[in-house]
Regions:
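Non-catalytic, usually N-terminal nucleic-acid engagement modules in DNA/RNA processing proteins
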Residues: 1-180
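Glycine-rich phosphate/ribose-binding loops and adjacent secondary-structure elements
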Residues: 177, 185-246
């Protein structure tokens, strides 16, 4: 994956991400295809009418349904859904947040119950990397915890330590494994830290040290005031590599 910064205007940036499945002009609107396809529209509308250059799939949901065996047999998510342009998968971290009543977190990972049938499952950082390799998106997200915007400092501190520990394990597993379908994949670390400036800055510096091909700023729009959200985004811009997609 390659990123080219083309224009700037203050803090605003326009750039071009190049993947093996095509190019993404940033900033970009990314339609959400939770289960691999975008609901309510045909694929040709996504490609021809909306001209979506990338869509998002969800690791948690794709793992449960249709499942990894079907996805691998199809040759990955691109072949499964017929979308031959870039794709991104989130790691399931937001679902860890949203399913708080049916999950249990530890340093090892996250134990949760399926929202479909109540069956028990376990996500570890290594396991999520393997799942995302099987799904086959061009851009993979690291496994993280997304704390609520109302979390107190003690919880946010503990959550960030968990996310940082998981990131080390994600990075190791990612570099120990290869893409399954003949094209490259990139892993993006995710900056967390809730609404706390010092934690956000600590996380931005920590994640930047991995030398990844791009970065995500996560844990936003989860209950915090809009003004705080924008402050926290602005507060990490200078700490995340400017020459990369983010």
């Amino acid at each position: 994956m390659k990123y080219e910064l083309q224009h700037t205007d203050g803090a605003a940036r326009a750039g071009l991400i190049t993947t093996d499945h095509g190019q993404i002009h940033t900033p970009i609107f990314m339609p959400v295809g939770t289960l691999g396809s975008v609901k309510g529209v045909h694929l040709h509308e996504i490609k021809d009418d909306i001209n979506a250059e990338i869509i998002l799939g969800n690791t948690y949901h794709l793992y449960l349904r249709p499942g990894l065996e079907i996805l691998e047999k199809a040759g990955g998510l691109h072949k499964f859904n017929g979308f031959d342009r870039p794709m991104l998968t989130d790691s399931g971290g937001f679902q860890v947040f949203s399913l708080s009543g049916i999950r249990k977190l530890s340093e090892e990972g996250c134990e949760f119950r399926s929202h479909i049938d109540g069956s028990k499952h376990f996500f570890s950082p290594e396991g999520v990397m393997d799942i995302e390799r099987t799904i086959g998106a061009d851009i993979m997200m690291a496994f993280d915890e997304c704390p609520p915007g109302t979390a107190d400092y003690a919880y946010a501190r503990k959550s960030l330590d968990l996310t940082h520990g998981w990131m080390k394990r994600c990075w190791k597993r990612f570099n120990e494994t290869e893409p399954k379908y003949g094209y490259s994949q990139a892993l993006f670390p995710i900056v967390q830290g809730c609404v706390y400036k010092d934690l956000r800055q600590e996380s931005a510096k920590f994640m930047s040290d991995f030398g990844a091909e791009g970065y995500a700023i996560g844990g936003l729009a989860v209950g915090e005031p809009a003004g705080v959200r924008y402050e926290r985004i602005a507060g990490v811009y200078g700490l995340v590599p400017a020459a990369l997609g983010r």
